[in-house]
Amino acid sequence: MIVLSIVCIGIIVGYYYYLTYRDKKDIENSTELTKVGEVLAKDLEKDYPPTPREVIKFYDKILKCYYNEEYEQEELEEMADQARLLMDEELLKKNPKDQYMLMLEADIKNYKDNERKLVDTTVCDSKEVEYKKVDGRECAYVVSRYFVREGNTYSNTSQKYVLRKDEDGNWKILGFKMVEGESSDD
């Protein structure tokens, strides 16, 4: 009987130790981030996307978070700051942060009010990126395609982004032109 009691106490103590240790280990190893968390965790000052295509891929990731994910107002502002770090000084001057935030919030509200979802984004292949010199500065043209669902209607939209290399050698978004695609009912 004493041996059985000692074994039971040992099992209880061992189980308690296991639960205590496991919880701490899980918290320490819990590096899974939400999509919003991934966007906010990227340090663009240390790890700026190296190519025009990668800049647009990260920008598209931000767009998907804007339109598809749940987040707090503070996180929206931080995501907007990340997006603005990808923009050329000329574009930033034309869109001061307060104005940018007002337009962004209105656009997101419209998107959600119409129950739209940004289903997928696709950036053109590297070989499809066009490089040109404009006014003595290196520019790149990158096309990104957006697949959007609104109810039972799907639409494809393409945007052609113009990026310009800054004095640090980083590609920054100077502007874009949207081209509407066809819609289909399913």
Named regions from a protein language model:
Residues 100, 135, 144-148, 161, ...:
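A mature extracytoplasmic/lumenal domain signature
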Residues 12-18, 39-40, 93-100, 115-120, ...:
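Short low-complexity stretches enriched in small and charged residues
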Residues 55, 140, 157-159:
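Hydrophobic core residues within well-ordered beta-strands of beta-rich domains
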Residues 34-115:
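Core segments of small alpha/beta cavity-forming domains
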Residues 1-37:
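Amphipathic, hydrophobic N-terminal targeting peptides for secretion and organelle import
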